[in-house]
């Protein structure tokens, strides 16, 4: 397995365009697979376990930039890529880039859990959205695979300054209908996005966990993580016990994404 967490500098590169990072990762997959098999003689290619970045360039918004960060969801289950974790639910140090020691340890536990399921059970499929449906002219359902039901967690995630549990909607009009409410579907496998009115513009888009709080007084960088970073509130209803503190449960969290809904 290759434990992959990288891309902060790519996020800051003004020349990065949509699709470029994924192309480079596919090239990397070919190269690293060839190198590892040549050295180990193993029969199966290694899994590339991607942890989605928590860092967001301060100039990026819900629907602009973040191409390296969002590549984790686009690459998931293509070839050897698996999106196994996201970072926004953890605590970061003051530079807004790096996890605390506890956060890094919890990240490692999440990666290990995904790899064990990939190799020794029915495989890891994570919580990357698989599609959407319009249940009505004002309700979008985002379908999310999960081992357990989905829940909205407003305890782990600080909701001060966070609208709609992390979800955003836009279209070509420049004045899209507002999101009126967010809920979990009755079967626990989808997120219901309710709009205040039916959209009149084309190219509707939904994003999740892509908006940070404003720069805090006295700070020089925007933070990452569960308190002020680009984050959301959707997680699994069950998880695993953290080995270093059995009172802590480590859940699966919905990774940041954008999806075109018409």
What are these regions (language model features)?
Residues 1-262:
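Cell-envelope and extracellular/periplasmic
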């Amino acid at each position: 397995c290759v434990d992959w967490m990288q891309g902060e500098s790519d996020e800051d590169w003004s020349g990065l365009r949509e699709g470029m990072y994924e192309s480079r990762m596919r090239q990397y997959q070919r190269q690293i697979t060839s190198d590892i098999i040549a050295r180990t003689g193993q029969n199966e290619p290694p899994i590339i376990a991607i942890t989605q970045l928590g860092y967001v360039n301060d100039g990026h918004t819900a629907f602009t930039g973040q191409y390296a960060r969002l590549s984790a969801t686009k690459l998931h289950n293509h070839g050897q890529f698996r999106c196994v974790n996201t970072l926004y639910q953890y605590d970061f140090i003051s530079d807004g880039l790096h996890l605390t020691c506890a956060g890094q340890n919890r990240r490692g536990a999440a990666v290990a859990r995904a790899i064990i399921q990939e190799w020794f059970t029915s495989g890891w499929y994570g919580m990357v959205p698989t599609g959407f449906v319009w249940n009505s002219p004002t309700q979008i359902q985002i379908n999310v695979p999960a081992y357990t039901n989905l829940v909205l967690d407003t305890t782990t995630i600080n909701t001060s300054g966070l609208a709609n549990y992390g979800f955003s909607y836009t279209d070509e009009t420049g004045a899209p209908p507002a999101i009126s409410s967010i809920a979990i579907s009755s079967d626990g496998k989808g997120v219901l996005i309710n709009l205040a009115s039916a959209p009149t513009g084309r190219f509707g888009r939904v994003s999740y966990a892509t908006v940070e709080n404003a720069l805090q007084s006295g700070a020089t960088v925007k933070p990452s993580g569960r308190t002020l970073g680009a984050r959301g509130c959707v997680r699994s209803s069950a998880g695993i016990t953290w080995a270093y503190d059995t009172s802590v449960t480590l859940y699966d969290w919905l990774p940041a994404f954008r999806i075109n809904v018409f």
